[in-house]
Each structure stands twice: as structure tokens, then as C-alpha cells.
Amino acid sequence: MSIFFERHNILCSINVDYDTCLYIYGNKQIQELLINNKFIAIEISENYPDLSDEDYIISFLLTLTDNVWLDDFGSGNATMKALIKNKYHAIKLDKSFFQEHMIKPHFDVIISNLKKLCPNIIAEGVENIDCHKLSKGIGLWGAQGYFFPSIPLTEIESIDSKWLSDL
């Protein structure tokens, strides 16, 4: 399965909460899995406790993989300080935040300022072709939502390479 992700240069993201991060911190086998599988991204929820403070667990995870993302940014639980404290590989915008602000004239300024702290911005809530075009038009690094078909991991090899490159 790792061959698929590596061949297409795509990432497989996994949502983790505080307890899961603690488990990874204490489990050498999972740490090795993350080190040896560069296509796995860890999405840390914005609900992670004290996200804006120094945190030895997040710092440790950042030593295991370059693919640590902050999830649900804009839902109101993290400040810019959280982005300054940790050098995340990507920031995923909260679905409601993206859908509320994407058509406002100041949205590109918000994205531009976020990119100063983390160049890879992902939009959650891309539900149709218009949202997808908008996310590409403002230079977002990635998009997630119902616009993209969901398939079981066991069928991932069936994804058409042309479809992936057209995104």
C-alpha cells in the first residue's frame, strides 16, 4: 500500500487527539512506522489541550516526521501563537471557517498571512467544483471535502492516475 502513496506523491493523513499523541510518544513501534513511512501525515486537532503553550509531545512528533499538521484551524480554539510555537507542515482550515470566509474580500489576506507561518494551507469543506476552483485560485496547497470521492483504503490502488494529476 505504501507504494501507491509514494508513486503518486500523496499523503495519507491520520487524525490524532491528545491521548493518541501520548500513545505515539510512548510506543517505539509506531514511532518507527512514522519514521519509515514518509507518506503518513499526523493531523493534530485544534482541540489539543494548551496548543499555544510549549508542548514536549508535539515537539517530539515533529522530530519523527515532517508531516505534522494542525487540523481545524479557525474553529476558535487556537491562536496564531500555536502556529508560531510549532512549525507545522500544513494547516487545515476548519470547514465552517473556510465556507464562511472564502467569498469575502479579505480571505486572500488571511491566507497570505497564514502562509507566512506555514506555506501549506488545506481547505476543509470543498463540496463542489466552485469551491475547488476557488481553493486552487487562491493558492491553497490542498483541499478536502465531498467534492472528492471517498473510497475504502483496500480499493485505493483503483484510483485513476489521470484523475489524481488533474486535481
Where are these regions (language model features)?
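Hydrophobic alpha-helical segments, principally membrane-spanning helices and signal/leader peptides
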Residues: 56-57, 79
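EAL-family c-di-GMP phosphodiesterase catalytic domain
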Residues: 2, 20, 43-50, 67, ...
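Donor nucleotide-activated moiety binding/catalytic core segment of transferases
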Residues: 58, 62
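Catalytic core of bacterial c-di-GMP phosphodiesterases, primarily the EAL and HD-GYP domains
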Residues: 1-56
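Short loop/turn elements that form and flank the Walker-type P-loop nucleotide-binding site
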Residues: 37, 63-64
